[in-house]
């Protein structure tokens, strides 16, 4: 088996009133938040799917199904810590992560360092092992119409 494995992940959630907006474990000031069974942190969800995909372990819905009441309102960083442990238990470590968050509003650049630091702490990585970029969809599609926010992630795993 190869010493390296890669995986990619994607997530999207609808923006709604009355919910907090949490990205990368950081709560952002915004009039709308992401709707979902857990805290709906699309960045953290995309990262979890990339990590699980790298080892052909399925997706986050398999481990944390939205039909299970125990995950209602769950903190995605706690779920991420469980995924990280699952990977470590199988003899792998994270080489690096890279991600893109697509949102028209709010502007994310001022929050990227805090997101990276929060994720690095949970994953026991150095912040420079985590890339987070933000872009818009130039007013195109559901994210462009500000109906939701999505995130893409890729993970490189290295055999211990």
UniProtKB/Swiss-Prot annotation:
Residues bound to a divalent metal cation: 11, 13, 45
Reading the lineage from the top rank, the first entry is Bacteria
Reactions mediated catalytically: 4-CDP-2-C-methyl-D-erythritol 2-phosphate = 2-C-methyl-D-erythritol 2,4-cyclic diphosphate + CMP
Q: Name one Pfam family in it.
A: YgbB
Give the protein family: Belongs to the IspF family.
Which organism does this sequence originate in?
A: Synechococcus elongatus (strain ATCC 33912 / PCC 7942 / FACHB-805) (Anacystis nidulans R2)
- UniProt pathway annotation: Isoprenoid biosynthesis; isopentenyl diphosphate biosynthesis via DXP pathway; isopentenyl diphosphate from 1-deoxy-D-xylulose 5-phosphate: step 4/6
Binding locations of 4-CDP-2-C-methyl-D-erythritol 2-phosphate: 11-13, 37-38, 59-61, 135-138, 145
Protein name as it appears in the record: 2-C-methyl-D-erythritol 2,4-cyclodiphosphate synthase
One of its GO biological process terms is: isopentenyl diphosphate biosynthetic process, methylerythritol 4-phosphate pathway
One molecular function GO term is:
2-C-methyl-D-erythritol 2,4-cyclodiphosphate synthase activity
Bound how, and how many: what does the cofactor note say?
A: Binds 1 divalent metal cation per subunit.
Provide the function of this protein: Involved in the biosynthesis of isopentenyl diphosphate (IPP) and dimethylallyl diphosphate (DMAPP), two major building blocks of isoprenoid compounds. Catalyzes the conversion of 4-diphosphocytidyl-2-C-methyl-D-erythritol 2-phosphate (CDP-ME2P) to 2-C-methyl-D-erythritol 2,4-cyclodiphosphate (ME-CPP) with a corresponding release of cytidine 5-monophosphate (CMP).
Q: Which UniProt keywords apply?
A: Isoprene biosynthesis, Lyase, Metal-binding
What cofactor does this chain's UniProt record say it requires?
a divalent metal cation
Instruction: Please name the top-level EC class of this enzyme.
Output: lyase
Q: What is its EC number?
A: 4.6.1.12
Assembly description: Homotrimer.
Mind telling me which residues the site (Transition state stabilizer) is annotated on? 37, 136
